[in-house]
Structures are given as C-alpha cells and as structure tokens.
Amino acid sequence: MNDLSHKPSVLVGMSGGVDSSVTVALLREKGYQVQGAVILFSPAHEKAVEEAKTAARQLDVPLTVLDARADFEAHVAAPFCASYCAGRTPNPCLLCNPNVKFRSLLQAADRLGCEKIATGHYARVEQDEKGVWRVCRPKSDARDQTYMLYGLGQEVLSRLLLPLGEYQKPEIREMARQAQLECADSPDSMEICFIPDGDHAAYIAARGLHAPAGQFISPDGKALGPNLGIDHYTVGQRKGLGLALGRPAFVREIRPNGDVLLGWSGEEFFRKVWLDRFVTPDGQPLAAGEYLVKIRSAAKAVPSEWNGSDLLTFTPAVRAPAPGQSAVFYKGDAVVGGGVIQQTER
C-alpha cells in the first residue's frame, strides 16, 4: 500500500528539560515516529540522564543513552582548558555541537534506523534556492540560538528538525504544562553544562592544570601587582579584578605569559578582528562583502565588512571581542559562516 501520510522516524536529543521534552511532543503530534537519546558527556551530566529518563517515561518514548565521554574530553574539555591557559576565552558549546553532540546523534540515528534528528534549539533550518541547508533565525528573537549552531554542515543540517524555531518560550512552557510534564517549570540552564557552579578556574585546577600567572599591567604600561592566573579573566571583564585604580578599568588583553593588560573604561570598543578556523554551511569560501555579524550569542548583529580571507571590520565598533570566541555571519535570517577570533585591533 502506498502510504502518503508516512512521516520519517526521528531521534530527538533529550536532556530532561522543557525544550527537548516539548520537541518530542510536537514531533509526535505531527506524526513522526519518535525516539529519544540522551548524551552522557561527563560525570556532571549524570543528573541530566536521569531527568531525560523521567521525561521519556512521561512521554512514552524509547530512550537510548549515548556515552560520549571520550569524545567530549578530546574535543571539548581538554581544548577548553588549554584555551583558557593560553589566555583565550573559549565557548564550549561551539566546540561541542559540531564535534560531539550532533555527530553522536547522527551516528545513533543511523544505528537505530532513524531518518532525521531533532533538538530543542530555538532556530530553524531552511534550504536556499541553491539547495544549501542553512540555520536561520527563529520566531523568538529573545531565544535565538543560531550563533551556537554555526559550525554545522550539510550532513547534519539536511537531516535536522528544529520545531521550536516557530514558537516563543512561554508557548513551550504552556504546552509542557498542558501535557503535565514534570519539567514544565524547570529553570533554563545558563551555566557551562559540565561546570555546574560556573567556576571554570577551579575546574581547570582540579584537572591538575595551572594557567600562567603574571602581572596586571596598567594602560600606561606599569606593573600593578600579581594576578590570580590568566584563567581567572576574560577580555572585557570589569568586576572582580581586585584593583583600586581610581577610575573604571577593564581587561583589554590577556597574554600567554600570564600578564593581564588593562584599559580605561570607554576604550573597550574595537573595529577589527582577525579570524581563523572559518567554516560555512556548504564548505565553500565566503565571498568578501558586507554581512551582519554577532560576536556573542546574546549580542546584536552589527554591520561588518569581510575581506574574504581573515579580516573583519565592524561598523560601528563592538565592545570587547575576545580571542577564542566566534564571530558568526548572517545574510538576512540565515547563518552563512563563522570563525574564531584570533586578534583584535581598535
């Protein structure tokens, strides 16, 4: 019999939270054959595994536990620590998504016979006029997570469903309440998921690593006294420096030798950054030209000029672009590429 109503089977990445749980419910309502998968990235994720099991029982979907601890250590935890110890400010989600999370989901989908994968990210996936799949902004600007997904290529995007891209967060919570899900009012996760207390310096130290510690250097080049180690600071930081300078200052530069260079408040705006590890959704070079660019997930996208190679010039200047973070490029609503900030210039 020719079943015109057939919907593909889909493997949903679950965490036990409201977003991934409602993703399961929405896809099942649309007729998809849904399975769940929860990824064990590190010991800190054991609670999420149990919460995902609870959600899967409530939703009556089979759940597979994926052990990605070795990949997470190699592709996220170790590079994260090394980057901080080198004076950079990494974003672990941008390391994890293309290298661990979505790769694990895709491999599991193949093993389980699922044609599609899905997550609870607030974004959309659309195919452009040339047949290229792209991550696009969601309906909810306040929840936009496209920045976090810029590293995904066609292998993932062509099979990825993101149903929450069409909804606002309050709508998702209301759906969870209507379904009487235990996670309906669970708080949003804001911290680094594998460092629940947010103290990345303590996490690095617990792994037996010691970031260089040098001097605070004043804007006019004078040594002001020892710092705690460069893993305690990030570019743009103003609070927690432990200095009394008589006027507001911020971290302008972090040097691998352990020194932390300061700037006066008002001087933290930069016009140029140099990027490397540049990627695009289709693997093709991004042409020189004008784009809207974000340097942080929650930042506003600003007009920028790309030289087609490595140099990005902002108009207007942006506050405290941090080496180790990513610059993500947009044309309209679509993500068209992104790279890692290596160097900045006022």
How would you describe each model-predicted region?
Residues 118-346:
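AMP-forming adenylation/ATP pyrophosphatase catalytic core
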Residues 1-150, 161, 170-171, 251:
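ATP-dependent adenylation/nucleotidyltransferase module used to activate substrates
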